[in-house]
Design a protein with these regions (language model features):
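Beta-propeller fold recognition
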Residues: 39-89
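Surface loop/turn signatures of beta-propeller and other carbohydrate-active proteins
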Residues: 1-20, 62-82, 185-187
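Short consensus segments that form the blades of beta-propeller domains
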Residues: 11-12, 39-43, 155-160
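Trp- and acidic/polar-enriched beta-sheet ligand-binding modules for extracellular glycan
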Residues: 125-127, 153-230
Length: 235
C-alpha cells in the first residue's frame, strides 16, 4: 500500500532519498533523507525530516507534507500527522512582491511561487537591496523562512564567511515599519533560515533587507511567511 514508503513528488522542495528511519525517546518514528535542488550540481541537496506513522494494518509510511513546512516537535508519543500541525497557513504564496532591483531572468515572483529551484535575484549584493511581500491583508504572523539562492556565488569549499546578515521588518500600512527579526550581526551559516517568532505580529507587509551577502548577488528562492488570517473556516 505504501510503496515507496517515503515519497515526496511536490511541495517547496521535493524528493526523499538516501534515507534512514529511527525512533525517538518518546517512541515516535522518523524518516530522514535528502531532498533535491540539483540546479548547480546533481548533489545540491537539503536534509528533510518526516514523521512516520502506521496504518490500521501495521504498515509504516512517512508523512512527507511536513518536510518543508513548520511542524510541532513533539514531547510525547503522537498518533497522527494532525498532532504535529501548528494550524498556520502559508500566507505569502503568489502574493505581490516589490524589490529594490531585479536581475534579468530572475523575477520577484520566483520568491513566492513555492519552488526552491527558481529564485529572485537583485542586481547586486549591496547593503540595502530588499524585497517586500504584500500579504494582501493584515495577518497574524507566527514564523518566517528565508531560503537564499546564492546567484553568481563564487565561493568554493567551506569558508568562515558563508553567513547571511539581514533584517526583516513588518508593517500594517507599508509606511511605518517595525523590526521583526534582526540578523544584522549573524555569523552562523543558515541558507534556509527558519525563525519562529517569540510572539506573533499583526502585519500586511513583510520586508527583508540585505546587510551582508557572502558571494554573488542577493537572491531568494523562497520568502515564506506562515500564520493566520481573521476569516471564518470554510463550511
Amino acid at each position: 500500500r505504501h510503496n515507496p514508503f517515503s515519497y515526496k513528488p511536490e511541495g517547496f522542495v521535493n524528493g526523499i532519498g538516501h534515507g534512514s528511519t529511527f525512533q525517538d525517546i518518546h517512541g515516535n518514528y522518523w524518516n530522514i533523507g535528502t531532498s533535491t535542488i540539483s540546479k548547480r550540481h546533481m548533489f545540491e541537496r537539503r536534509v528533510s525530516l518526516y514523521p512516520v506513522f502506521f496504518d490500521k494494518d501495521g504498515d509504516a509510511y512517512a508523512y512527507t507534507a511536513w518536510g518543508d513546512y513548520p511542524m510541532i516537535v513533539p514531547d510525547k508519543k503522537v498518533s497522527s500527522p494532525q498532532d504535529l500541525f501548528p494550524e498556520w497557513m502559508l500566507l505569502s504564496y503568489k502574493k505581490e512582491v516589490e524589490t529594490s532591483s531585479t536581475l534579468e531572468g530572475y523575477p520577484a515572483a520566483n520568491a513566492v511561487n513555492e519552488d526552491i529551484r527558481t529564485w529572485w535575484s537583485a542586481k547586486t549584493a549591496d547593503k540595502g537591496e530588499f524585497m517586500t511581500v504584500d500579504l494582501g491583508q493584515n495577518s497574524k504572523i507566527y514564523a518566517i523562512q528565508i531560503n537564499f539562492a546564492d546567484q553568481d556565488a563564487m565561493i568554493s569549499g567551506k569558508v568562515d564567511s558563508t553567513f547571511y546578515q539581514y533584517r526583516i521588518e513588518d508593517s500594517q500600512d507599508g509606511i511605518t515599519w517595525n523590526m521583526t527579526v534582526d540578523k544584522s550581526e549573524n555569523k552562523v551559516e543558515a541558507p534556509n533560515d527558519y525563525i519562529q517568532l517569540d510572539k506573533p505580529v499583526n502585519a500586511r507587509y513583510v520586508r527583508i533587507t540585505n546587510i551582508y551577502f557572502p558571494s554573488g548577488k542577493f537572491s531568494i528562492s523562497g520568502l515564506r511567511v506562515f500564520g493566520k488570517v481573521d476569516k471564518p473556516l470554510p463550511a
